[in-house]
Amino acid sequence: MKINEVVKITGLTKKAIRLYEERGLITVGRSENGYRDYSEKDIKILEQIKLLRTAGISIIDIRLLFSEMLSLDDVIGKRKKEIEAESGLNSERYAFCETLAQRIANGEEQTRIPFTEMEDTLKYGQGALAVGIDIGTTTISAAVIDLENKTQVEVFSIPHSSYVKNSVFFEQSVSVIIDKAVKTLELIYKSYPNIASIGITGQMHGIVYLNNNGEAVSNLINWQDKRGDLPMKNEMTACQSIKKITGESIATGYGIATHYYNLLNGLVPQDAVGFCSIMDYLAMHLCQIKRPVTHTSIAASFGLFDVKKACFMHDKLLELGIDASFLPKVVASNEIIGKWNDIPICVAIGDNQASFLGSVENNRESALVNIGTGSQISAVGEIGTLGDGIEYRPFINGEYLICGSALCGGSAYALVEKFFSNQNFLNP
């Protein structure tokens, strides 16, 4: 059937129907004369889209739902939380969400439900785009950026649920993370073939062991891992042993501490020839290269790294019996390491560095303050003498990020709020 018939049946505008096709929500066949020919299946899909959009569920989340990267419960649950934050549990839209799954299961007719696609939703980037992807501890996030207008076109956030349940340590499935990250990029590429570059960042400190073919031969042992603090045969922990032997302090969860513990306890995979971060491994996988390339910002997060010289402390590693060949190649510039679908991919950078780079307009004239559970302030500067609690971190192109972190942050605000809410100061 032709689009005018579809408009009458669904109550959607032509612009909205074309938008859903452009965004990859429906795939419309063509008649012999080249005109779009909508099927009954297309009508059913459009009716589902209208129900979901009426509930306020984003086009992004609908795409993730149709791609089976999110479940219906996921998208409805997310939307209910958004509505609860915006207008509370008693709103009409919240009540609509409560019955949405049943409406879809029943194949409910939607022509009686008033809905008009927002006009600004019908506009999206047509020029050159950049894609950034972030492999977080619990989610994979991606952003599509219009390079000419410097505007955000779309943002994706997908839980990866990758923790290995039968592990006594903090380990995550590499295959689950990489599969979801690649599917996210494929979904974006399908809608936006005009991507000019891809940038990658993610959770720091953790490591993935690799074999000679550049394949993962272990889970991701992430930054939360506590094996570095476990007592060993001499009753010292791996972190204490590193301090005693090298004089350098390193925290559990850092890649070198993890690898050192594994060496001492026979836990390094037999076919492992090296290790890298999870975002380095994603870049390797996309570019089909066999050796990891690690930016200084990530290498520093492994520990025993000389920030000023931009290299690992090889003498300290030798004292620990760590083979330097296990370490990834380190670069200080944000160079292109390969291509995916002819799109250049830059070496991955640390999440702190990426958040600074993406948040400020001028690197040299800005400071970034992040307040989460704790708090952090970052600014670009030169190597010098710093006080306690302040550290230099590698930035991009040989520059340094000066960072100060504190436990006091959002948790302190929450404590103050709780204190006053438990008092009767406002109700004498």
Predicted features and spans:
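Active-site core segments that coordinate phosphate-bearing ligands/cofactors
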Residues: V131-G132, V144, M236-S249, A257-P292, ...
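Gly-rich Lys/Arg/Thr-decorated short loops/hinges at beta-loop-alpha junctions or inter-strand turns
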Residues: H160-F169, S241-I242, V293-A300
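Acidic-glycine-rich active-site phosphate/pyrophosphate-binding loop
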Residues: E154-S157, L230, V331-N341, V380-E391
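N-terminal glycine/serine-rich phosphate-binding loop of ATP-dependent small-molecule kinases
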Residues: Y124-N219, D271, I343-V347
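Basic helix-turn-helix/winged-helix DNA-binding cores
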Residues: M1-L64
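Short, charged amphipathic alpha-helical surface segments
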Residues: K50, L64-E119
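Short beta-strand-loop/turn "lid" adjacent to the catalytic site in phosphate-handling enzymes
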Residues: K190-N222, S249-G253, A283-D306, V331-A332, ...
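Carbohydrate-associated surface elements
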Residues: D225
